[in-house]
Amino acid sequence: MTTDLHVLSAEEVWEVIDKYGKAAKRTKAAGFDGIELHGASGYLPHQFLSDTSNLRDDDFGGTPHKRTRFMIEVLKCLIDAWGDSHRIGVKISPGILYNGSVENEVEETYTALISQLNELDLAYVAFQTPESLRSLAGQDNDDIAGGEIWHRFPYEFIRENYNGTVIASGDLTKELAQNALDAGKADLFVFGRAYMSNPDLVERMQNDWPLTEVDMRRGYGGGEEGYNDYPTWQEQQAQQQQGPVG
């Protein structure tokens, strides 16, 4: 059975928001410590923020401020369901081109969004950069080569506008993260793919051991290979000392 595609009515939008709250209650009952709303990378909350995907002309679209309403109402619903705003965070990705997302009014929209996020007193705001730092590193750019990436959007934009804890992500290296931290442009940093292929990532960074590159061909599906079988540094050294098998 299929249903014809249609624009959500305002009533249906509120029903979706309510489902977030119900999910939050189940999450808390299951014993989780908190919730991060994924408002980035072209997913539903991000689609409401974008002027190219959100063509509504009601309370949930038509202006930068109205386009922020869905995400803000979802966050309020999560806070109400959990009972503690410090257990709720949100991830955003201003200007990112991912999963078909395109935004033409980035600063106007995210200025309106962040001013409201300040009022919610969340645990944190996490962001993903709109450009791949790994790709940027291949360009002739002295700042990138020197490990300074924090001056690129949206590091300073978010730091200047958001009053709480800021978490940065996006193809980071230890050097890039440390320099951004030293510059005061973020408080915490996310290493997602690096952790997939380096179960001992913290120890590797502490000891300046080289990192194992992740095989993204297995990053989003497939069998069990590449899921949790990457060796630690110590295991790699032991394997090399043993030599080839057979």
PLM region spans:
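Flavin-dependent oxidoreductase catalytic cores
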Residues: 1-246
